């Protein structure tokens, strides 16, 4: 039995950034932490996940857990660690005749230690109230009720394996359901060995969460990304793209630099261009939007900061004769080109009829309807980010301010520029909020396309409806764009991105289907 113990909610600091969720549901690498934890379970061992009884698991998370044969155990709220463990084991109905693996819900490892009757240990890195390893045979493990003053102590870090789980339950029960006291009793009865852990990552506190997340990202970073505790360096074989991003950061007006990480310069080494930014211990909005449970009023503050940035973009004077990204280049021209490419690859035509939600519609009609509602009139020219979507926006909860990364910095024909029509950035922001792009990228959808009939379900949670409506009103008040404008621009974006997702047919199908979903919303706005 492999039990992931996530039967309590995250602490107050983490709750302020991610909402009231169990630790195993925290975001990590655009997935939930439990998806990484389940992968640690030895092959052939049944996996269980304990959760607070009051926590409502979303349908899509339920489906993932069922698909990976993970059994949820709902334990009463407010139990101590020891009582929660005993409750989980009793509720599970497990025979307790086979070895028991226990993993804390806020913990991850590169790999699990090997052995029977073991306690995984690490050296303390931070000053928290850890349980420490001692030389005392009676109290082999001790709870430290005050922050530790030095770093040399070994602490238990969240993985255990017991050969006699029934004896463990007896020991914890006899210790008045105190987990550490129960472990000491088991140590005297059966014996436990301390084993050094391999790649321990702790997500239980806000500081350790961000440090562990940085370490996790570093371990899985592409060759083109170098991450240290202080900076991140980006490079690519696509030199022109990196040079354009560096140009944007290098030339950004001083008034706007509060909205980016500190820019640390670029270099050209043996023909390979790279640049560095300060590494920020913050979460990107795509992970917050999909995986957190933040109330609508927090989202309104986040979006207000994003709009503040875009308003500041609009205030910047455009240099005479500078290349400019115009709306027609970024939408109509690019959409037509990319859509033709997609149709050719799929062996379909723009005039083919598709059925979605009981209506027959062609791609050509969707393009025409969206074209009709694209913003017209005077361009909103200023500094253009060019890819202002949730995955490129970080949020600092302490400062109530966004930080943005990965700008475009050039025109479609390759000219470096800071400038463009910021309505394109509004479209990119909309395609995250209204278009639910990040839910699709995270795999939180169901799509079926057969005989030109399209079915799409995105697992978006209902509490985002208020956030979406607030966003539409905020954009209309600030920039004069209507809901129709926003949906029309998104449709163009989703159609134009289709060839870029050819590496994943199912995801490409979902993005394709989403254009039909957005088109239906656009039609309803017209009625």
Question: Predicted segment positions?
Answer:
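N-terminal nucleotide-binding beta1-loop-alpha1 segment
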Residues: 1-21
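Conserved alpha/beta core of the MobA/IspD/sugar-nucleotide pyrophosphorylase nucleotidyltransferase superfamily
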Residues: 2-6, 96, 153-229
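Conserved beta-loop-beta/alpha segment of the NTase-like Rossmann-fold superfamily
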Residues: 61-137
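Conserved core of the sugar-phosphate nucleotidyltransferase
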Residues: 108-186
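ATP-binding glycine-rich loop module of kinase domains
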Residues: 220-250, 285-292
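Conserved kinase catalytic-core helix
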Residues: 288-338, 351, 363-377, 491
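Active-site acidic catalytic loop and adjacent metal/ATP-binding pocket
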Residues: 368-420
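Active-site activation/catalytic loop segments of kinase-like enzymes and analogous catalytic loops
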Residues: 410-474, 491-506
